Structure formats: C-alpha cells, structure tokens
Amino acid sequence: TLSYQRDLLKMADYLEENGITDCGKVTKTALNSYILFLEKEGKAASTISRFLASAKSFFGWMFREGKIRRDPADSIHAPKIEKKVPVILTVDEVTRLLEQPSGANPKEIRDKAMLELLYATGIRVTELVGLKLSDVNMSIGFITCRDEHKERMIPFGHAAREALAKYLEAARETFLKGTHSELLFTNYSGREMSRQGFWKMLKGYADEAGIQRDITP
C-alpha cells in the first residue's frame, strides 16, 4: 500500500542519514532510535504503530526470504514515554533551582547534570541514581530505564544533554578516582548515591534558591 511504502521510505531516509544503507545492518537499537525520532516530531501513537506494523512486515519478509540473517523488528515495541510527575514548583522556582549548581567545581557539575536530567525526564530518584553509563545515548538524546517488567526509553532535551556532556567530560573521573564504575553518577567514594544523599543535595539547592515550600524528589 502507499502508507506501507511511505513508512519504509521515511525510515530508509532516516537510517541513511545515520550511516545505515544495508538492510542487513539495521539493528533493534536503530529502529528504536527512529521511533524516538518520530515521537520527538510529535507523531501520533497511531502513526508510530502503523510504522511498526510496516517494519515488522518488511523485515519479517526479508528474514524469511533469507535476505537478512536476523529480524531486527521481531521483538521491538514502541517505547513508552513516562508521564512526568506533577510539578509542585512554579516555573520561576524550577529555573532558580536549576541555576543553583553553577558548575564551579566537579560536585556542582555533577549536581547540575542530575537536576537537569531529573527535570527533563520525570524519572524517579531511585532510577536516576541507578542509571548506568550504558543507559545514556548522547548522540540521539535518550535514557533507558529498566525494571523487572519493562524497558522505557525516555528522551531528554538540549539543556540536559549539555549538562551531561560537561559532567562526562570534566567531572565524572574526579568521583571515580581512577577506579571503574558502570554507574553514570557516583558519590565521592565512587559508589552509588543514596536517595537520601540526593534529597539532601536537592534540599540544599532549594534553600539557596529561596524556595520555602517542602519539596521532595
């Protein structure tokens, strides 16, 4: 059908722009990246579902015909974007809070990245402190959160990407002190931050920003 052809042509254009011109080299990650691209463009869920049906049909046929060695669309699902928790702060208060870590030292660079990422994605604090380096895709701009039942791919914007890039380049090694860690964020001992530790940090910046109300992460 025309819709089927149009879906595949748009996908092919996106993949080609990202250096993938051979169907045999298309991966599940590449298809998930395209789905995130469609979501960022504001495409309706029905449009993304139709693309998935087209992709599954096309790659399933290619696999059955022996034209590709594996079907990248076989187990793919549309990533669910987590709804952000209701914001209890005003826009002005959020702006002031995010401005508090000025980035004058490694701790403030790390804290800035954590606050920006938390605000951009709406994930839970336990998910934030448990993120691994491999959960972050800087080139496309999304994080992957997992639990026992599902995997969520959540996009983030320019401000969070900029803060993360600065942290990874200029501050993360300071906390690791020459050791290795899969964690994205660590404390000064190179270990996972506790939820209480993050709360204490957040409360400190809220006080500096002159925010009187009792906020919780």
Give a label for each model feature.
Residues 1-217:
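Conserved catalytic core of the tyrosine transesterase superfamily
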